[in-house]
Amino acid sequence: MDLFPLARPLMSLMDPETAHGLTLRALRLGLGPTRRAPDPVSLAIDLFGLHFENPLGIAAGFDKNGEVPDAMLAMGMGFAEVGTVTPLPQPGNPRPRVFRLPVHRAVINRLGFNNQGHAALKKRLLARRKRPGILGVNIGANKDAADRIADYEAGIRAFEGLASYFTVNISSPNTPGLRALQNKAELQNLVARVLAARKGKTPVLLKIAPDLNAEELGDIAEVALEQGLDGLIVSNTTIAREGLVSGVNANETGGLSGAPLFPMSTAVLRDMYRLTGGRLPLVGVGGISSADDAYAKIRAGASLVQLYSALTYDGPPLVARIKQGLAARLAADGFAHLKDAVGADVNL
């Protein structure tokens, strides 16, 4: 059942965070739509020892506390990523902290890693551990942590065996000083400690910011390849505001997501594919709201893609539209499989 067309007019009048809470509640009650047909074979891809039926996933931030991953998978997502989760519960920044920019099909948030902590998420994931589907856990650090890297190590230890993969989130603009962990020396230490915290081989991906210069991107690519990260997620929200018209909410502080992020995040994706020589799987995220957007990310180097903000404007039907359109674009360009199109627009 898809109630979004009926609920959208009312929800658009609500505070965005309140509306999102109602969305999660509806999904918990089983009121979300379910996929009715299998995905086209051309959309399947194997990465990290995992088989993805399609490359479209829900980005972290939608389901911070792991309340509805199975509802998102049932909706037709190829994978679901929960979090960001920190060791201890924290309330995040004061409300209001999420702002719509409808004229730009964008959102600004300064949530600040609000979440219920490791224990609450672990309890939920233990309860669903035998269910099928690829589930990533996005781990972060508490705002007041004395040793933030230790918080990431704790995330690995807490969810190994429950997560299909990990995302190390060091690129949120809403936790003061967090992005400094992207600096080369800090990053080398972080990656070494996080990878050493694993007992097994659960894939570890790093989520990076779009607001990085060429030297910083080069350093991240070098560290990722040399130290054996399994992949990168490109990218988080941006602190830039170029192209936004002045108006309601345009000057709010926080991370900007949605359509205005697409050009910047795709450019960084393309650069990272080139810098890594196509040897490191990349997940493209930032401003995807159509099959054309998803296909552009793939041709720029993404093996998987994620969306979130566009769902707040277009609702669950967007998932099927993107998958159907993506399969059609692959066929039109002569690609039998998704993997054949990855990086097609990048000269290595």
UniProtKB/Swiss-Prot annotation:
Any GO MF annotation of the entry: dihydroorotate dehydrogenase (quinone) activity
Pathway where it operates: Pyrimidine metabolism; UMP biosynthesis via de novo pathway; orotate from (S)-dihydroorotate (quinone route): step 1/1
Pfam family, any one: DHO_dh
Annotated signal peptide: none
Subcellular location field: Cell membrane
Keywords in alphabetical order: Cell membrane, Flavoprotein, FMN, Membrane, Oxidoreductase, Pyrimidine biosynthesis
Residues holding FMN: 60-64, 84, 138, 169, 207, 235, 258, 287, 308-309
Sites where the protein binds substrate: 64, 109-113, 169, 174, 236-237
Top class in the EC scheme: oxidoreductase
Coiled coil: none
Cofactor note: Binds 1 FMN per subunit.
Cofactors, names only: FMN
Gene3D superfamilies: Aldolase class I
Active site: 172 (nucleophile)
Reactions it catalyzes: (S)-dihydroorotate + a quinone = orotate + a quinol
Chief location bin: membrane
EC number per UniProt: 1.3.5.2
Membrane topology of the entry: Peripheral membrane protein
GO CC annotation: cytoplasm; plasma membrane
GO biological process: 'de novo' pyrimidine nucleobase biosynthetic process; 'de novo' UMP biosynthetic process
The protein's role, per its UniProt record: Catalyzes the conversion of dihydroorotate to orotate with quinone as electron acceptor.
Stated family: Belongs to the dihydroorotate dehydrogenase family. Type 2 subfamily.
HAMAP family: DHO_dh_type2
Record's subunit section: Monomer.
Protein name, entry field: Dihydroorotate dehydrogenase (quinone)
The species this protein was found in: Parvibaculum lavamentivorans (strain DS-1 / DSM 13023 / NCIMB 13966)
Lineage: Bacteria, Pseudomonadati, Pseudomonadota, Alphaproteobacteria, Hyphomicrobiales
